Regions:
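N-terminal export signals
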Residues: 5-27
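C-terminal and late-domain segments of enzyme folds
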Residues: 32-66, 80-92, 122, 170-172, ...
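General beta-strand structural signal in soluble alpha/beta enzymes
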Residues: 45, 99-100, 124-125, 156-159, ...
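Short, flexible loop segments at the rims of nucleotide/cofactor-binding pockets, characterized by
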Residues: 47-49, 100-104, 132-136, 196-197
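Short internal beta-strands
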Residues: 70-74
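Portal/gating segments that form or line small-molecule/metal binding sites
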Residues: 76-132
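Class I SAM-dependent methyltransferase SAM-binding "motif I" and its flanking Rossmann-like core
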Residues: 125-203
């Protein structure tokens, strides 16, 4: 089978081995506990690099022994390389991995967006062009369905465009010539700056925008570092390397304050 045929035809793929240590977080056992966990709205982001450790952590957050995790590569224009990388990153984990492309035709797509997106335990959004991602989601009503997913306790997440999309606004490379700003879904209040350590222009622009009041205070994440939110509360800061950091950036007495948030290592 050709690679492109594999990508377009493989709406659901199954991979498996095991979550780290076989651990399942509290809330997965008793029926009452599972209901309680489902009412908590969860988002897991990374500044860049939503790879196997982050996917493993998301799987644990679902509270399921073998969760269904779906990749939504809209921002990357349904890149075949990104989809293949998704399955490769899921391969060591005991998850049921799938993906849903956005560039579809009614003759090829039998299920509605809600039937697909609301039937899984976690949704990971790709990096890419955030501006295009937002426009496509709104045109299809995917933005509203993602809100339903969040409200139902389906774990949402991603890196780069896949982290920025959940906030009210943030910095983006989605337009020609220079970094700019983009308005997003607003599930998480405030702003976001991904790739904080990886792209030279990100930090000074973010400081300028927050300092001038053009952008709300928010969270900056290095590549390989991220945040787990329950509702709009930071519950845990994580990283996959020692020098990857997360910061809260705000305006205090007319000055930009960058506060480093201690991160826990995940593997």
């Amino acid at each position: 089978m050709k690679r492109r045929e594999f990508i377009t035809s493989s709406v659901a793929g199954t991979v498996g081995a095991g979550l780290a240590g076989g651990a399942t977080p509290a809330g997965a056992g008793e029926a009452g506990e599972a209901v309680q966990a489902a009412t908590t709205r969860k988002i897991l982001i990374a500044g860049g690099g939503f790879n196997t450790p982050f996917i493993r952590y998301m799987a644990q957050l679902t509270g399921k022994a073998r969760p269904k995790l779906l990749f939504l590569p809209t921002a990357s224009a349904d890149s075949p390389q990104g989809i293949i990388a998704w399955y490769r990153n899921c391969a060591p984990l005991n998850v049921e991995a799938s993906h849903q492309i956005s560039f579809i035709a009614s003759t090829q797509q039998a299920k509605g967006w809600d039937e697909v997106l609301l039937s899984v335990d976690g949704i990971v959004c790709s990096g890419g062009n955030t501006l295009n991602q937002q426009v496509i989601w709104k045109a299809h009503g995917i933005d509203a369905i993602l809100r339903q997913a969040w409200d139902r306790g389906i774990v949402l997440g991603g890196a780069s465009a896949g982290s920025l999309c959940w906030f009210e606004e943030g910095t983006t490379d989605s337009r020609p010539k220079e970094l700019s700003t983009v308005q997003c879904l607003g599930f998480l209040k405030g702003s976001h700056c991904p790739h904080y350590d990886a792209e030279a222009g990100r930090r000074p622009l973010y400081h300028k925008l927050v300092g001038s009041g053009q952008m709300k205070p928010g969270y900056a994440c290095d590549n390989d570092a991220g945040i787990y939110f329950e509702d709009n509360t930071v519950k845990r800061v994580v990283a996959t390397r020692a020098d990857a950091d997360v910061f809260h950036v705000s305006l205090v007495d007319g000055k930009v304050v960058e506060k480093k948030l201690p991160a826990e290592r995940i593997d």
